[in-house]
């Protein structure tokens, strides 16, 4: 007899676009089209399901951790819509209000793929900052409301992973 209350559930998700796979829209309900490109939306659905079903913590790695622009403190009129950051923040807020332990561990790239000083990477880092700011603000508000003596970084922990970046290397 296994005690499932003490078991772990680990899922691995990998996103794909029509650049990396031959996608047939007639065979999948999770394909969306954005700017003329097909992408598989099932990863977002899977993340949301895992976030909502998690009990004590969630661990995720993402090269591009940004989204939920509709909840940002500063409205930048950006189409950075996916809901995963807001889902994580909401889960943490719910756990704070119920007095339960919960931590989100998010590992992000020090620099997204591309030239670190380039406009696109700098814009992505800015959006990532707005995303983290929104999450920490919501968590801090829940901590204040409940009188919980913790700090938001004790509930949502961002860790930076250094990824090697090479520009036009020649042997």
In which residue ranges do the predicted regions lie?
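Charged, low-complexity intrinsically disordered terminal segments
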Residues: 1-171
């Amino acid at each position: 007899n296994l005690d499932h209350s003490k078991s772990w559930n680990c899922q691995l998700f990998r996103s794909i676009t029509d650049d990396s796979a031959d996608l047939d829209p007639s065979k999948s309900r999770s394909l969306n089209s954005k700017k003329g490109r097909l992408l598989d939306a099932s990863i977002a659905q899977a993340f949301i399901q895992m976030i909502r079903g998690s009990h004590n913590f969630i661990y995720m790695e993402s090269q591009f951790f940004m989204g939920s622009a509709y909840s940002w403190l500063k409205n930048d009129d950006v189409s950075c819509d996916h809901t995963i950051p807001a889902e994580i923040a909401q889960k943490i807020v719910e756990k704070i209000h119920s007095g339960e332990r919960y931590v989100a561990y998010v590992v992000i790239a020090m620099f997204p793929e591309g030239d670190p000083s380039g406009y696109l990477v700098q814009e992505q880092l800015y959006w990532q900052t707005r995303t983290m700011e929104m999450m920490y603000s919501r968590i801090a508000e829940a901590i204040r409301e409940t009188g919980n003596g913790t700090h938001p970084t004790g509930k949502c922990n961002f860790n930076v992973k250094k990824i090697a970046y090479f520009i036009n290397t020649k042997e």
